[in-house]
Amino acid sequence: YNPNPEDLKMLKNLSEEVIRNNADIGFAFDGDGDRCGYVDNNGNEIFSDIMGLLLARNFSEKYKSSKFVIDVKSTGLFGSDKILKSNDASVHYWKTGHSYIKQKTSEISALAGFERSGHYFFNKPIGRGYDDACLSAVEVCKLLDENPGSSISDLIENLPHTFNSPTMSPECPDNVKYEVIEKVIDMIEDRYKNKIKIADLEISSILTINGIRFTLEEEYD
């Protein structure tokens, strides 16, 4: 398989090794060492945005009023998390792509930037602003060390339950993909404006900085 933290074959192999060795956590590094994926102590994949949320919570306790940048594919839990809010942390959704997240993290002097593909950017005093998978793993190990009574699966279990899917990339020819995106944006914006429901739920907010992201009422995201 390709050394890709989002590759399910790679993560399955890592999961088997975590179980076989009774490990506390498994780390999946990509080929050039700037992305990291995760498997918990039970052998379950941890999506990178969820791990980013755990780290952001931990950082916000130490560095009050911190800023965090996340890509638009990330969980909506960032925007509703009570710990982040209690520590006066601010969350900024931005375009998908490691270069975009890196630039925005630097531009607004955010403490950290998390991209769902596994690129994490840490500014001082944690890091130096670039994506370093080894540093990501170190910070996760610190998180576990600072919570000696909890496994990584325990920490995740304490989060509100959400439903996630792997990154999906349907085939779309280059010469029509932007047209398709615009049509989808127009359709969702029309439903939002006219309060047309999706699965019996109204759209409560939309975000169009990179394609379109919409949130349904009752915080389904």
Regions found by a protein language model. Give the residues of each.
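Catalytic-loop motifs flanking and including active-site residues across diverse enzymes
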Residues: M10, S48-L55, D132-S136, V140
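Short glycine/threonine-rich catalytic loop with a Thr-x-Gly-x-Asp
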Residues: P5, F29-G31, E45-I50, I126-A133
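Self-splicing inteins and homing endonuclease
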Residues: I25-G26, G31-G43, T105-F114, I212
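Short, acidic/small-residue loops that bind anionic groups at enzyme active sites
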Residues: E45-K62, K95-T96
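Phosphate-binding and adjacent anionic-ligand microenvironments
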Residues: Y63-D221
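Buried hydrophobic positions in well-ordered alpha/beta secondary-structure cores of metabolic enzymes
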Residues: L11-S15, F27, D32, A56, ...
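Short Gly/Thr/Asp-enriched flexible loops that form oxyanion-binding sites at enzyme active sites
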Residues: D34-L53, G79-D81
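N-terminal small/polar loop signature for handling phosphorylated ligands or for N-terminal nucleophile
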Residues: Y1-Y38
